[in-house]
């Protein structure tokens, strides 16, 4: 990446593997660059998933039918309990929509919240991909085969935006600053 000589990571214990000159939290970068709404670089899509994985996921998702395919994420990571309750909702709130003819829902939900699928009424249709999404490249390949992603404010929403997929983002009443509450779109992603 232009301007970045090297990315230094932490080892499994959380210690840095090397010394470095500068550290900046990711969400501080727009402030450092004096970013304004009209200077946000949103030329997307800027992430392209592995074509072999995309083809594998196409076969996996085409098995079910030719309907409009929607990925769904209803909960953020439970690791941050305060944000979890502000950003997450329960899957059963979506239950009326899950059986609409012509729509196929695929759960992109990871972690404990994916178990909520087991609590839905019999006959409610949502395909749980939790065990098949081994890493973020699987998630990217699966999203590439969907028509829409509906998500709470999580990394999956950002990934879908970076892939150029349409995203319906479910925000809390007082959302994070980057979503600009006076708008109904996002300048961060052109889709």
Predicted regions located by residue number:
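Catalytic machinery of carbohydrate-active enzymes
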Residues: 1-191
């Amino acid at each position: 990446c232009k301007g970045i000589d090297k990315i230094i990571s932490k080892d499994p214990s959380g210690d840095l593997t090397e010394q470095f000159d500068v550290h900046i939290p990711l969400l501080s970068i727009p402030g450092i660059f004096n970013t304004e709404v009209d200077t946000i670089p949103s030329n997307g899509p800027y992430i392209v998933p592995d074509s072999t994985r995309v083809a594998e996921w196409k076969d996996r998702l085409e098995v079910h039918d030719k309907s409009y395919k929607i990925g769904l994420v209803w909960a953020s990571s439970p690791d941050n309990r305060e944000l979890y309750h502000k950003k997450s909702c329960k899957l059963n709130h979506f239950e009326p929509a899950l059986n609409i003819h012509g729509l196929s829902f695929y759960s992109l939900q990871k972690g404990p919240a994916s178990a909520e699928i087991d609590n839905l009424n019999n006959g409610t249709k949502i395909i749980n991909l939790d065990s098949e999404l081994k890493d973020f490249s699987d998630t990217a390949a699966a999203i590439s085969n969907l028509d829409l992603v509906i998500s709470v404010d999580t990394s999956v929403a950002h990934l879908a935006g970076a892939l150029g997929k349409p995203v319906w983002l479910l925000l809390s009443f007082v959302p994070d600053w980057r979503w600009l509450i006076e708008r109904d779109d996002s300048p961060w992603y052109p889709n």
